Amino acid sequence: MSSDDTTPDETAPEHSPEPTPATSRRGFLKASGLGLAGLVVGGAAGAAAGAAIGHSIGYSEGQDDLGALTPRQVAGFEHIVVLMGENRSFDNMLGWLYTAETLPQGAKFDGLAFGDYSNKSPDGRTVKAHVYEGPTDVVMGKPNPDPGEEYPHVNTQLFGTVDPASNAELFAEQMHYPYNAPRDASKPTMDGFVKDYHINFERLHKGKEPTNEEGDQIMGGFSPEMLPVLSTLAREFAVFDHWYAGVPSQTYCNRSFFHASTSHGHVTNKGAGGYSKWLDAQPTPTVFNRLEEAGLTWRVYFDELQLISLTGMIHAPVLEKYWATERFAYMSQYYKDAREGTLPDYAFIEPRMVYNHNDFHPPFGALRESVIDGEVVVDSAVSDVRAGEALVHDVYNAIKHSATDKGSNALNTLLLITFDEHGGTYDHVAPPSATPPHPNTQPGEMGFTFDRLGLRVPAIAVSAYTRAGTIINDEMHHGSVISTLSRQHGLKPLNQ
């Protein structure tokens, strides 16, 4: 698939049309992404706003004694569409988006071209952050194999620690306390990515050490030319360079946090109880429930090949009753809704995450060995970021070409593209601390106290009223969309 096939159309509508009584929303958007940090709660207050960062022990989830917020009074977009990819850090996807020569005048961008970033390899070599090199079909599937993404692996990546040392030989669910976390109040050094990748590689390959090329790929990332769709949208609209995952771990807990402001104390997908722990979780309300209570519309779109919605499964205790309703629909319905102007007030899009991936996830799964032309080839599940690019292209164009007079259209719909977690790929920015959900909070799974956020992930806001070249430096995290919807519609908060 050539870049010409996937780059957003050059005939995109003007980003800053002259105000008219029917379309002027600049007072709300301020020509800056999601209405900037005033709309999506950020900064120190942002960390506090996501107080229930993944936890439930010692905390009353979805408290009903919280009053509804006052709806906003300034006109703005009426529809929000979120597309969430999988397992890529900000630096891995967008770290090279701008250089000193291409940076918009007066802007700041916390990317890789503005510093000297590296990790040490186990043999003492300096491995610098770099742009991927090699054949296109190989580069588009890097890093391969998939990095470690569970909480203990993230600890090694952030702090460079493996504690106890025996954890290096175990899979995450078998590891022991303190699960590679430092035993003091150390701050993240961001120097353990190569170390952890070597550990994970050797475990997956049953003791075989990676070559320098294999081990160094964890410090690699994509150039803008390699990701023409994401890069074009990030430059032509707004990019957030400090948007953090809610939990320093993997998919389920971060996707749970995104819509419920809690991961029920979990930091792994299936450790400590298996996948059933999500089905048996407390019936904690989500933002979907708040929208339903307010008489507003919402819909989760997922691929037909996926068979079930992961969002629906993660929040089964409160969303199962909607599984067989119009609230959960295939992607074909999304394109129909966008075309006919019937997108809901809030839409969440899931890519294919199990079969024939278009979610950007690095190749993962059991390693397979094959002999081809006498050479042993070891690989895992096929995954290619170009498939994710194609999905973003299609989702964006469906909104861009929506021109209905009533309902949703290109002028009143905001598209947010983000990712659930960094997935073990390199990022140079240490995640900030966060406010634990309760003064007497007890440790959750693997002893985590939910006092720090996950790593940076890509986040791009696309709106007809967003000025090209907008870079939002304010601190955001996965609780920000809930905050936006709550303030936009006067919903009852999910937590304090």
What does each of the following model-derived ranges do?
Residues 2-5, 10-23, 30-496:
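N-terminal pro-sequences and low-complexity stem/linker regions of secreted or lumenal proteins
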